[in-house]
C-alpha cells in the first residue's frame, strides 16, 4: 500500500479547465457568464486579493496565497466574482484570477483526520493513499457518490462528501 500523507500546503498540478455543463432548468445563472450560480472554481495564482466590494477601490479584506484553492462563486458583477472559501469568508475577486479547473479541499470540516484514497469507487477496494485534511486535490470526475482525484504522487477515489469543492450528489465529467 502506498502511503501518501501530504501537507496542507501542497498544491495540485495544473490541468486544463473543462467547459461546465449547462445549468439544470430553473437553476440560477450568472448575469454575466450565464453559468450556474453558485458554482465551484479555483484560484489561478498564488496571490489573490479578496475585496470588500466589486472594484479595486474597495479595501482588500484578505489575501489568498494558495493557487488551486477551491472557492465557490456566489455572484457576478461585470469583471468581478463574489466568492466564498471553505471557512465561509466572502468577498470579491477579479474573474481573471479564477480558473474553471475543478479542485477540492480534503476534509475541510475535519481538520485533524486523514482520509483514504481508494483504488476504485468503493470502500471495499484497496487503499491507494491517505491524505491529511486541508490537502488540495484535482478533481477528474465525480459520479455523485465518489470522485476520481489526483495530485502529486497519487490518484484514486474519495467519498464525495469528504471533499469541499464539489456539491453533494454533483456529477463532474
Where are these regions (language model features)?
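Beta-strand-rich domains and repeat architectures in extracellular enzymes and scaffolds
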Residues: 58-60
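Bacterial N-terminal signal peptides
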Residues: 1-10
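Sec/Tat signal peptide C-region and signal peptidase I cleavage site
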Residues: 12-16
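SH3-family beta-barrel domains
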Residues: 17-52, 63-67, 74-77, 84-86, ...
Amino acid at each position: 500500500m502506498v502511503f501518501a500523507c501530504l501537507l496542507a500546503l501542497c498544491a495540485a498540478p495544473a490541468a486544463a479547465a473543462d467547459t461546465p455543463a449547462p445549468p439544470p432548468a430553473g437553476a440560477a445563472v450568472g448575469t454575466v457568464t450565464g453559468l450556474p450560480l453558485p458554482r465551484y472554481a479555483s484560484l489561478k495564482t498564488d496571490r489573490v486579493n479578496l475585496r470588500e466590494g466589486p472594484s479595486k477601490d474597495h479595501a482588500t479584506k484578505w489575501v489568498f496565497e494558495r493557487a488551486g484553492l477551491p472557492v465557490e462563486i456566489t455572484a457576478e458583477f461585470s469583471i468581478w466574482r463574489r466568492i466564498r472559501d471553505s471557512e465561509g469568508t466572502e468577498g470579491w475577486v477579479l474573474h481573471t484570477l479564477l480558473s474553471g479547473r475543478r479542485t477540492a479541499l480534503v476534509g475541510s470540516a475535519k481538520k485533524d483526520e486523514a482520509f483514504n484514497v481508494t483504488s476504485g469507487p468503493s470502500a471495499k477496494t484497496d487503499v491507494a493513499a491517505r491524505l491529511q485534511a486541508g490537502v488540495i486535490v484535482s478533481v477528474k470526475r465525480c459520479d455523485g457518490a465518489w470522485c476520481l482525484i489526483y495530485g502529486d504522487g497519487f490518484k484514486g477515489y474519495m467519498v464525495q462528501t469528504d471533499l469541499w469543492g464539489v456539491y453533494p450528489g454533483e456529477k463532474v465529467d
